[in-house]
Amino acid sequence: MPRLSAKFTLELSAPCLIAWPEEEAPRVTAPYDGLQVETRLVLAQDWRSKAKDDPDWTTTIYAIELTVSADELDSPPDVIKTPDNQRDLRPQQEYLDAKLPKYQAAAIEISNRVLHFFQYRLFTPLVRPIPTWDQALHNPTWFDADGQELSGGTRTIVAQPVPGLRGELGVRKLTPGEFPALETYIVEPKEPSLAITLLSDAQSAWFEGNLRRAVLELAICTEVLVKRRFFAQASPAGAAFDYLEDKAKVSVRVLELLDAVAEEAFSRSYKKQEPSNYQSIDHLFRCRNKIAHRGELSFRDDFGKSVNVDASRVETWWQAVTNLKAWLEEL
């Protein structure tokens, strides 16, 4: 059975620290779904550091090189010589294109296992999984059983997703109409409010796929929006409320403030005026509590049914919070 190998070199989103003896960095070989994957950590050559008592130099891993190999039932086709002495790579390209998905899947899985180890075992900051659109995943170097490079591998360009291109979670484009505001901001910058900062953090977490953090940031943002509107910090009432809340003498739920308390204070009830968005805020806080107490991204609806939370639902909650922000500003 002919041996086929694909070599992927994947650059990391953040450098991972390594303190290793002078010899070459470690390699790990492991099976995955019928394939053999050799992982080599690629070390930076432009810097290293060594404290007085350190036995080895410290540097960073900036890439992971994975060689994925398998025994195939069929051999790669030879490159065809055309009558005009040109090389026809198409048969070999088609062969390698058909083989790519399983080799690619192994490279993604093993590389992300390495990154998970650094993120959660060694607590390396800013580590992100290798995305499926990474160009290197689609353009490996192929080798036959003799270690000879196969020239039929295609060069594929994969478009990187642009967060917010379709306007998700309030993303807007700079247009001629917005340009005067940019000019003004450059001359007179303004610090964003705490609520806006929290909303932005929730948005970033959502685009990163960190839904737990997005939910927590949204819930905190909602509390800040509501309590600062009802109990202005600069007012005696606000100072009194903060004191009593800090001393655990008073506990007022956001949902109560948005219904009966709002109707008493402002003759308007968010629950009555925006029932769908009010329900979204309710579910947001139920999920926040589930995360805080059990770490689970879910909540129970009014019928006691457990509901798993996905990106679409968090997007709905984000829109409800922005709707609530606008409603509060009108009071």
Locations of the language-model features?
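Basic/polar, acidic-poor N-terminal "presequence/leader" segments
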Residues: 85-155, 300-311, 315, 329-330
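Charge-rich, solvent-exposed alpha-helical interaction surfaces
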Residues: 99, 106, 113, 243, ...
